[in-house]
Amino acid sequence: MRLNDITRGTGLEEHGITNANLIYWTPPTAVLYEQIVKRGEGLVTHLGAVAVKTGHYTGRAANEKFIVDEPSSNDHIAWGKVNQPFDSAKFDALFGRMLAYLHGKDIFVQECFAGCSPDHRLPVRVITERAWHSLFARNMFVRATPEELVGFKPGFTVIDLPAFHAIPSVDGTNTETFIIVNFEKRLIIIGGTSYAGEIKKSIFTILNYLLPQHKNVLSMHCSANVGEKDDVAVFFGLSGTGKTTLSADPRRRLIGDDEHGWDNSGVFNFEGGCYAKIINLSPEAEPEIYQTTRRFGTILENVAIDTVSRRIDLNDDSFTENTRASYPITHIPNIVKSGMGGHPTNIIMLTCDAFGVLPPIARLTPDQAMYHFLSGYTAKVAGTEAGITEPQAAFSACFGAPFMALHPSVYAKLLGEKIARHGVSCWLVNTGWSGGPYGVGSRMKIAYSRALVNAAIDGTLNAGSFVKDQFFGLDIPTGCSGVPAEVLNPKNTWVDKTKYDETATMLVERFRKNFEQYRSYVSAGVAEVM
């Protein structure tokens, strides 16, 4: 049976789904709320958000992601630890069991787009067994109009079945959990995890494969906003480094908070929603994001809730530190409704330095920007991936290696060309530790990071003076309004200066060792940055 009183779309027979029970076709938020409550998937909170639990996985299952090894994509994929190959025949067998599992079950279907640019958007169909995952897809992707839903043809389909588990000895998976991309069949299958982030990041992987190759569009793991003078700022960074927080500025309009493309016209958001980390969120430091946790339509993942009063506690990390809010971007008051902007004036590369030796901000030359983009140094922040309980130093190419299907040099080449063509100012911002490493120093104050980013974007820092860092070769500003002068140079914040020198030297060596894999792909100027 199909509930088609909401809208009609193309049937599911093309996916092999023929024996489902009720099919909820592009249901609106209110209907999904009803189903979430009816099916015991979540609770409506005080003031109207819906709280859910993701179960065992409270972050991405990074080691359970695969790409089917098939002729159409084999030569293009950067195979390795991130992009693990999966046998085509085993995919077919596993998918066949998933179809059998769906027999007689209710399913939810959302039809939407990935990409705000009409020239580059990808039609996406998301099929889920849980109502709240359907709401997640509705929040996170670009909603289709009623006219666009008529005869909708998906370019890619996601089938997400958390209660279906693989059999590793039979299916060739590492565990019972799997996220498998099949470019030939234009299909993504997910099982054994309720963490909704797998849905959006799988589609991000698809765009990272398609757009650079076929459209010459740079796909970026970044947030973006625009000022009153139409000056666009792009913020690169891994989860937990501050992309969402620093780009949500009441004085600038938000283009998007996590995934963007950069084409010949400018930047555009891949998404129609935001997926913000909300642990210890405060109305004073992050008012725009805070108010979304009190809105109808927002999903609160793994947030503590009083089941009687339905009030939430954003400071409670008893389930995970990776508490999240998923909400449509329209919940943010100051946005670019089209999701598109011009070419960036400034690029901010965010890092969470667990060692506390990088400055809170530094100006980058074009060569340094390329080097740091390929390095993608940061820390794996607690809770962002399953099994991570405290920050760990890591290098993640393009500030998003887990989602990059092609070799990092493909993205770096496009970035370098665009920086040169448009004269973009580039900055490295450390939102991590100051005064010592994790466990000794303290996390950089959000207020300081905001002040530094604002001064970079409005040109104040460029107009001031700089000193050269002796270890990383970075230009460090000597002053910034709202930030104590001693904070700007990280060595000044350490009690043990000798220990700082030793730690900085160690990190430089880590940079050099990691960059060896890219030296043959870059110019001499980039290779000699460190």
Curated annotation (Swiss-Prot):
Pfam families: PEPCK_ATP (PF01293). PROSITE patterns: PEPCK_ATP (PS00532). ATP binds at K201, H221, G237, L238, S239, G240, T241, G242, K243, T244, T245, E286, R324, S449. It is found in: Cytoplasm. Its EC number is 4.1.1.49. Pathway: Carbohydrate biosynthesis; gluconeogenesis. Transmembrane segments: none annotated. InterPro entries: PEP_carboxykinase_ATP, PEP_carboxykinase_C, PEP_carboxykinase_N, PEPCK_ATP_CS. One of its GO terms (biological process) is gluconeogenesis. Mn(2+) binds at K201, H221, D258. One of its GO terms (cellular component) is cytosol. Its cofactor is Mn(2+). Substrate binds at R60, Y195, K201, R324. The keyword Kinase does not apply. Keywords: ATP-binding, Cytoplasm, Decarboxylase, Gluconeogenesis, Lyase, Manganese, Metal-binding, Nucleotide-binding. Belongs to the phosphoenolpyruvate carboxykinase (ATP) family. PANTHER family: PHOSPHOENOLPYRUVATE CARBOXYKINASE (ATP), PHOSPHOENOLPYRUVATE CARBOXYKINASE ATP. Involved in the gluconeogenesis. Catalyzes the conversion of oxaloacetate (OAA) to phosphoenolpyruvate (PEP) through direct phosphoryl transfer between the nucleoside triphosphate and OAA. This is Phosphoenolpyruvate carboxykinase (ATP). It comes from Geobacter metallireducens (strain ATCC 53774 / DSM 7210 / GS-15). The lineage of its organism: Bacteria, Pseudomonadati, Thermodesulfobacteriota, Desulfuromonadia, Geobacterales. The gene is pckA.
